From Swiss-Prot:
Residues 356-371, 382-402 have a biased composition (Acidic residues). Residues 522-585 form the bZIP domain. Belongs to the bZIP family. CREBRF subfamily. Residues 534-541 are annotated as: Leucine-zipper. Probably degraded by the proteasome. PROSITE patterns: BZIP_BASIC. GO terms for cellular component: cytoplasm; nuclear body. Keywords: Nucleus, Repressor, Stress response, Transcription, Transcription regulation, Transport, Unfolded protein response. This is CREB3 regulatory factor. Residues 308-414 are annotated as: Disordered. Residues 317-329 have a biased composition (Low complexity). Residues 372-381 have a biased composition (Basic and acidic residues).
Length: 640
């Protein structure tokens, strides 16, 4: 049958009929159809199709053939084939009618219903025969992969592909293995096997490829390129698709391969077109698909390499990303653990508090709270607004105990004992809080549970985060701040004294303001705004004061640490000398020597009494000593 004239057609159809490249268009899944709003969605790839009348025309593509005489062997054999044109005439008639009255880009006669895609509308489909319509697969059949076995695949009837048993003698192709260019498989979550015609000349492929097509290209007759096309059966042929089980004679893949590829999704169209554009090259020997992961390669390629001589290579090996092995969650864990005081199972359990501690907290909240100046100077709140501003710091505890919580090496038997120590120390101090004591509202004891050494395991071992000279100071990482001297740990007692003076002035200003309740309604919002500004400035100053006070504490603790080490080393040396020279006079006993060393070397205690130490430094600074009595401290002239 002659091809339809393309002279009067629109350019899209003219190009399609002039082109001999068959575009692999697969049977779209109903999910794609349902999600597509464009009525021409299924037929966009039709622009590149060549509507061929006879399936035998698909065997040879004459584009790359330079010598037509080389094809006489094939044409002589193919002339003996019966021409099956009944179905194809109907298809060509449909295409002619469609192109004669409509354009592909604006097919108004095709609606957006699913029945229109199946060719079942009542006015435009060429298939109105009840017998043909009865053979049309339903949507349930098209989506029946979930109920089918993995080896089930879409199998097309023999009427669409008819080849005589021995059209080509085996002697015509000595030592040449020719496999069909299988169509791109139907989109499915199951593994589909490529159908191979049961002809003697076309041998089954034993070479897996890393794409959705099985392509073996050979050089024949003096390296002349001949592209063999077995009929592509993956276009949308309305009302002619049947779902049949695979023939028993076809070998199946091993169970390991099937299970591994059970959830794979096949590529459609695009990968096949990409494969076609590659150069036609001869492949010799066995090819191994390049899989993305080593585990997947071992799992899927081992059965193929062992049993592949008699198997049909499947076409899903290039789309295995969905079934790659998921790495174990334990492998993702870091070797070093930063949660030294928190275990994984403890995070799920809420921290338990004893009711006695809650009662103590309530009692402390009921007590009147106030700031302390230098030692004995008390600044009592004189109005309600200042008390509201002080409510943010009701949960404050002695800094000595809170420092104990934050020390990484601190160990105790229970959180209750630590809370008891906190409450006792708070009672001893009479709930007095110094101006430089600022709480972050949540102490580490309320956030996390301290682990005993017996509870340590490989996941809670200390890491380099807790080294003394590491990048991090203490348990928590250094937070980003706007202060440029955030890493400078040199104390500046004079700056701390100035902050204290500013805080006293601010408290005086806030206390002198008229209470909001005594102001008229129109003036209350402005008064509240001004007081909030003053309170915010006081809050910022308290943070700075706490930072400066912590630097003073750190300096004092380091000095005391060095002095204690000196005392210990000195007394150890005395003990060694006493043991080595027992005949020497023992006028001062070892206990007396130790007391003398402590008295001469150690000054006032710092550890456990950091608040008193800071107040002593502030007192000396107020008297005119810029260093505040800190040993070894040198204040730059710019900061004096």
């Amino acid at each position: 049958m002659p091809q339809p004239s393309v002279s009067g057609m629109d350019p899209p159809f003219g190009d399609a009929f002039r082109s001999h490249t068959f575009s692999e268009q697969t049977l779209m899944s109903t999910d794609l159809l349902a999600n597509s709003s464009d009525p021409d969605f299924m037929y966009e790839l039709d622009r590149e199709m060549n509507y061929q009348q006879n399936p035998r025309d698909n065997f040879l593509s004459l584009e790359d053939c330079k010598d037509i005489e080389n094809l006489e062997t094939f044409t002589d054999v193919l002339d003996n084939e019966d021409a099956l044109t009944s179905n194809w005439e109907q298809w060509d008639t449909y295409c002619e009618d469609l192109t004669k009255y409509t354009k592909l880009t604006s097919c108004d006669i095709w609606g957006t219903k699913e029945v229109d895609y199946l060719g079942l509308d009542d006015f435009s489909s060429p298939y109105q025969d009840e017998e043909v319509i009865s053979k049309t697969p339903t949507l349930a059949q098209l989506n029946s992969e979930d109920s089918q076995s993995v080896s089930d695949s879409l199998y097309y009837p023999d009427s669409l592909f008819s080849v005589k048993q021995n059209p080509l003698p085996p002697s015509s192709f000595p030592s040449k293995k020719i496999t069909n260019r299988a169509a791109a498989p139907v989109c499915s979550s199951k593994t589909l096997q490529a159908e191979v015609p049961s002809s003697d000349c076309v041998q089954k492929a034993s070479k897996p490829t890393s794409s959705t097509q099985i392509m073996v290209k050979t050089n024949m007759y003096h390296n002349e390129k001949v592209n063999f096309h077995v009929e592509c059966k993956d276009y949308v042929k309305k009302a002619k698709v049947k779902i049949n089980p695979v023939q028993q004679g076809r070998p199946l893949l091993s169970q390991v391969h099937i299970d591994a590829a059970k959830e794979n999704t096949c590529y459609c169209g695009a990968v096949a077109k990409r494969q076609e554009r590659r150069g036609v090259e001869p492949h010799q020997g066995r090819g191994t698909p390049a899989l993305p992961f080593k585990e997947t390669q071992e799992l899927l390629l081992s059965p193929l390499t062992q049993d592949s001589p008699g198997l049909v290579a499947t076409a899903e090996s290039g789309s295995l990303s969905a079934s790659t092995s998921v790495s174990d969650s334990s492998q993702k864990k870091e070797e070093h653990n930063y949660s030294l005081f928190v275990s994984d199972n403890m995070r799920e359990q809420p921290t338990k508090y004893s009711p006695e501690d809650d009662e103590d907290d309530e009692d402390e909240f009921d007590d009147e709270d106030h700031d302390e100046g230098f030692g004995s100077e008390h600044e009592l709140s004189e109005n309600e607004e200042e008390e509201e501003e002080e409510e943010d710091y009701e949960d404050d505890r002695d800094d000595d105990i809170s420092d104990t919580f934050s020390e990484p090496g601190y160990e105790n038997d229970s959180v209750e004992d630590l809370k008891e120590m906190t409450s006792i120390s708070s009672r001893k101090r009479g709930k007095r809080r110094y101006f430089w004591e600022y709480s972050e509202q949540l102490t580490p004891s309320q956030q996390e549970r301290i682990l005993r050494p017996s509870e340590w395991n490989r996941d809670t071992l200390p890491s380099n985060m807790y080294q003394k000279n590491g990048l991090h100071h203490g348990k928590y990482a250094v937070k980003k701040s706007r202060r440029t001297d955030v890493e400078d740990l040199t104390p500046n007692p004079k700056k701390l004294l100035q902050i204290g003076n500013e805080l006293r002035k601010l408290n005086k200003v806030i206390s002198d303001l008229t209470p909001v309740s005594e102001l008229p309604l129109t003036a209350r919002p402005r008064s509240r705004k001004e007081k909030n500004k003053l309170a915010s400035r006081a809050c910022r100053l308290k943070k700075k004061a706490q930072y400066e006070a912590n630097k003073v504490k750190l300096w004092g603790l380091n000095t005391e640490y060095d002095n204690l080490l000196f005392v210990i080393n000195s007394i150890k040396q005395d003990i060694v000398n006493r043991v080595q020279n027992p005949r020497e006079e023992r006028e001062p006993s070892m206990g007396q020597k130790l007391e003398i060393l402590i008295k001469d070397t150690l000054g006032l205690p710092v550890a456990g009494q950091t608040s008193e130490f800071v107040n002593q430094v502030l007192g000396k600074t107020a008297e005119g000593n810029p260093t505040g009595g800190l040993v070894g401290l040198r204040i730059p002239a710019s900061k004096v």
